[in-house]
Design a protein with these regions (language model features):
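C-terminal amphipathic helix plus adjacent low-complexity
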Residues: 2-10, 14, 366-419
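Conserved nucleotide-sugar phosphate-binding/catalytic loop shared by glycosyltransferases and other
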Residues: 19-21, 26, 44-99, 103, ...
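A short, glycine/small-residue-rich beta-strand->loop->alpha-helix junction that serves as a flexible
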Residues: 26-39, 63, 244-245
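Conserved nucleotide-sugar donor-interacting segment of glycosyltransferase catalytic cores
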Residues: 109-175
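A nucleotide-sugar donor-handling region in carbohydrate enzymes
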Residues: 152-246, 272-275
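Donor-nucleotide binding loops and adjacent catalytic segments primarily
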Residues: 196, 211-309, 362
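A donor-sugar binding/catalytic signature common to diverse glycosyltransferases
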Residues: 299-343
Length: 419
């Protein structure tokens, strides 16, 4: 009876069966990708649903810079940051990592207890960072909360993903706590969990949604873009910027070497770029008439929509934006410490959606990049390739959410009848 009472009372913010509370745990130890994906899903869930409230839990230091839809808010936990050697440390607090994780876990559990979500969506990590969400998952499961794991289209190559998930107890957690797994991609492109020894019932609960379509935001009223954006230009984005130094350097070198490149380039550094590297890049850019740069743009979709073509590393969110805004794209994926971007770019190039240029340090020839940039504007757009369901991700999530909302009264009635 307790579970039935909780579900009936959970949606106090709105009316009828459309009232619901959703908690999203956004993995946040590196870059912007997880936060931006969680934000897109949260905004979709509250669209035309005034009774739905979504809380995002994140440790991202820039979450406050983003706009969220009505009904969406966030709780920021103390941040952690991934170091170049693969270790982690507390981002701002002068405490040991274990203490920071303990504090994060306590805030997560308190938020879950107080907010009382009907649905929980966990991004990427079934146990969270260092197992921090497991205590909350145990209590949520006892209350009958529906729990979903959401993963991007590509995690990593199986040889690395399998031991990582074994070490974290991720498969056991997936079987114990989760009702569904949503893959934000297409099975025809890649199966991110195929190498894992998942129980049959877990594998049956995997749903492929398609990629998450991005809509065009309103024009930023406070953002001043370079003059070069008033005409045709190439946009270079490395996402958060924490690992995009080599690509930025390669593109700048191409312009410095080849005066015949027609289109100017606008480079978005990202908020996590190394300060010294950014200063060095800015000096080189200032000396070149066809190069401009901006630090960071929370409405990158607007700038990308104005661009003629895009150069990027091919993280999940940028890939979704390239597809949604239908831009010819040159993807230069990183190949360490994960092969995620390379695998995505390889399969996307196979379908003709993008062109890939592998960043081999030994062959990082400016002339090679210049040739790729010169060919980019004439490259076909993603929409010229027909892939059914390619950008249906948010629509599928909304339909599954709506179906679950419609089923709740029936499930409550069954629960009460059983009592």
């Amino acid at each position: 009876m307790a579970a039935a009472t909780r579900v009936e009372g959970a949606g106090s913010a709105g009316g009828g069966s459309e009232s619901a509370r959703v908690l999203i745990y956004s993995h946040d130890t590196f870059g912007l990708g997880h936060l931006r994906r969680s934000r897109a899903i949260a905004n979709a869930l509250v669209t035309d649903r005034p009774g739905v409230s979504v809380v995002i839990i994140s440790g991202s230091p820039v979450i406050g810079n983003f706009e969220f839809g009505s009904g969406v808010d966030y709780v920021r936990v103390p941040g952690v940051v991934k170091l170049p050697n693969g270790d982690y440390r507390s981002l701002n607090l002068n405490v040991e990592l274990d203490e920071a994780v303990g504090l994060r876990a306590a805030i997560i559990q308190q938020t879950a207890d107080t907010f009382g979500p009907d649905l929980v969506i966990v991004d990427k990590e079934p146990t969270g960072f260092r197992g921090e969400i497991v205590p909350a998952l145990e209590r949520l499961k006892e209350r009958g909360t529906r729990i979903v794991l959401g993963v991007r289209d590509v995690m990593d190559e199986p040889a690395l993903l399998v031991p990582e998930w074994e070490r974290k107890g991720a498969v056991d957690a997936l079987a114990a706590y989760y009702d569904e797994t949503w893959v934000y991609g297409l099975r025809e492109i890649y199966e991110p969990l195929s190498g894992l020894a998942l129980p049959g019932e877990v594998r049956q609960r995997i749903a492929y949604t398609g990629y998450l379509r991005r809509s065009l935001p309103q024009e930023p009223g406070f953002m001043r873009y370079p003059k070069s954006t008033k005409g045709p230009f190439i946009l270079l984005t490395t996402g958060g910027g924490g690992d995009g130094d080599d690509l930025i350097d390669w593109v700048i070198s191409a312009y410095e070497t080849d005066a015949g490149l027609d289109l100017p380039a606008v480079i978005v550094f990202g908020p996590f770029i190394n300060r010294d590297r950014r200063r060095s890049f800015a000096e080189r850019i200032a000396r070149h008439p066809k190069l401009d740069a901006i630090a960071f743009d929370t409405k990158l979709e607007y700038l990308m929509n104005r661009a003629t073509a895009v150069v990027a590393m091919g993280g999940y969110n940028t890939f979704c934006e390239v597809l949604s805004l239908d831009k010819p794209a040159l993807i230069v994926p990183r190949t360490s410490p994960r092969l995620e971007q390379y695998i995505r770019a390889m399969h996307a190039e196979r379908l003709g959606l993008v062109r890939m240029l592998v960043d081999d340090e030994a062959e990082r020839d400016p002339a090679r990049m210049a040739a790729a940039l010169r060919a980019l504007p004439a490259q076909k757009r993603p929409s010229q390739v027909i892939v059914p369901g390619l950008l249906d991700g948010l629509d599928v999530i909304q339909r599954r959410f709506a179906g679950w909302l419609a089923e709740r009264p029936r499930r409550i009635a069954i629960s009460e009848a059983a009592e």
